[in-house]
């Protein structure tokens, strides 16, 4: 950058430059100068171990707009020279940056942003030089100076990548756990197996049933004779059985004894006897607490129901007086004769009233009261208000 800035500062409008390294055949009159393209390249005398890249020969080309023949010729010559110069400069600069930078990744990014900037092409005729990857541009003499970079771990940004990372971690943990499990001592496994066998034998012996006599063999003598006539060959075969067969037979005997105990009639019957318990007060509905005629809410439901029954029976047994008309034709003949004898002397209404009075005392009392009221109705009414006022004054 220092070389580029110096060129821009020393450039003048009349076409003169401070540097005098311009060959004669490249000079163009100032009337045709419209733009300047330049780049920095090392000289042939410069050694590859120079401390700075800016030391070198500056070459530039003036690109005219007219005529077209000159422009095309300048494009062809300038593209070849610029591509060669730029490629050599970038290679030198990349090697120099890699050798001097302690952290190559940061320095390379800065140099890449500077060197990868395209050359100023106002007419757009020159070709852009090919890109050079600085990480791979290593000379054989500088291999030892490069710092080995550790491979960066990519961070998953999608759901699929995250799931793959999680599954990888789980697989690693599973492999580690399986390795630790394989390191368990065989002695512990054998002790566990022996303990389980002992517990199994103890359980089989604990639930082994007592031998029961066979009733059929005792009743039938023929069967007992058959049992006594067993051949000696069969006894030898039974004696030569292995321990495993004996254990299997013991297990079968214990199972058969358990099944016999379940089928025996001495045990509890298959169908249990269901005895219905007496209902509690909480199980009886609340409607029975309010029996008609009883208002005792604290009384139990059963007693309340009994009281309601006795109350209903007592109502049926009580005889209540009824209004019976003796003049009705269904009455007794004595009453009819008595009524017929008195009809001539008394009027029909009086006779009927007297007959009713015998059977219903309420009607007679009401009639007597009504008659007395009629008699006293002719007397003037008392002035109660005046009497009360006079008593108050006295």
UniProtKB/Swiss-Prot annotation:
CC annotations in GO: nucleus
Main location: nucleus
Compositional bias segments (type: Polar residues): 191-207, 216-230, 370-379
Positions carrying Phosphoserine: 117, 121, 379
Compositional bias annotation for Acidic residues: 178-190, 231-263, 284-295
Top-level lineage group: Eukaryota
Chain intervals for the UniProt region annotation (Disordered): 177-295, 315-347, 370-394
Key words, A-Z: Nucleus, Phosphoprotein
Protein location: Nucleus
Record bears the keyword Nucleus: yes
Keyword Phosphoprotein: yes
Coiled coil (residue ranges): none
Protein name as annotated: Uncharacterized protein C1259.08
């Amino acid at each position: 950058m220092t070389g580029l800035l110096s060129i821009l500062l020393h450039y003048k409008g009349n076409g003169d430059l401070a540097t005098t390294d311009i060959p004669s055949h490249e000079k163009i009159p100032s009337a045709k100068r419209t733009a300047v393209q330049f780049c920095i390249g090392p000289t042939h005398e410069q050694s590859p171990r120079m401390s700075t890249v800016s030391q070198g020969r500056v070459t530039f080309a003036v690109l005219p707009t007219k005529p077209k023949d000159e422009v095309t010729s300048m494009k062809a010559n300038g593209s070849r020279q610029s591509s060669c110069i730029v490629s050599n400069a970038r290679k030198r600069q990349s090697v120099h940056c890699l050798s001097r930078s302690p952290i190559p990744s940061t320095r390379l990014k800065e140099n890449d942003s500077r060197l990868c900037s395209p050359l100023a092409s106002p007419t757009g005729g020159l070709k852009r030089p090919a890109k050079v990857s600085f990480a791979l541009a290593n000379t054989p003499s500088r291999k030892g100076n490069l710092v080995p970079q550790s491979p960066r771990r990519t961070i998953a940004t999608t759901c699929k990548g995250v799931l793959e990372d999680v599954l990888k971690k789980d697989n690693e943990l599973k492999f580690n756990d399986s390795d630790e499990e394989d390191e368990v001592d065989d002695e512990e496994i054998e002790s566990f197996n022996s303990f389980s066998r002992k517990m199994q034998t103890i359980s089989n012996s604990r639930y082994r049933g007592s031998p029961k006599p066979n009733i059929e063999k005792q009743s039938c003598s023929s069967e007992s004779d058959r049992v006594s006539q067993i051949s000696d060959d069969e006894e030898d075969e039974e004696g030569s059985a292995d321990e495993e067969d004996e254990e299997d037979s013991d297990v079968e005997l214990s199972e058969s004894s358990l099944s016999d105990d379940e089928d025996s009639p001495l045990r509890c019957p298959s169908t249990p006897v269901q005895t219905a318990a007496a209902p509690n007060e909480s199980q009886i509905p609340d409607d029975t607490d309010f029996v008609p005629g009883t208002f005792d809410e604290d009384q139990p439901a059963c007693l309340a129901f009994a009281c309601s029954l006795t109350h209903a029976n007592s109502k049926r047994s009580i005889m209540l007086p009824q209004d019976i008309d003796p003049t009705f034709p269904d009455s007794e003949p004595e009453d009819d004769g008595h009524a017929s004898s008195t009809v001539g002397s008394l009027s029909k209404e009086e006779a009927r009233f007297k007959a009713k009075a015998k059977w219903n005392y309420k009607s007679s009392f009401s009639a007597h009261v009504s008659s007395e009221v009629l008699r006293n109705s002719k007397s003037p009414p008392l002035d109660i208000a005046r009497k009360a006022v006079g008593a108050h004054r006295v």
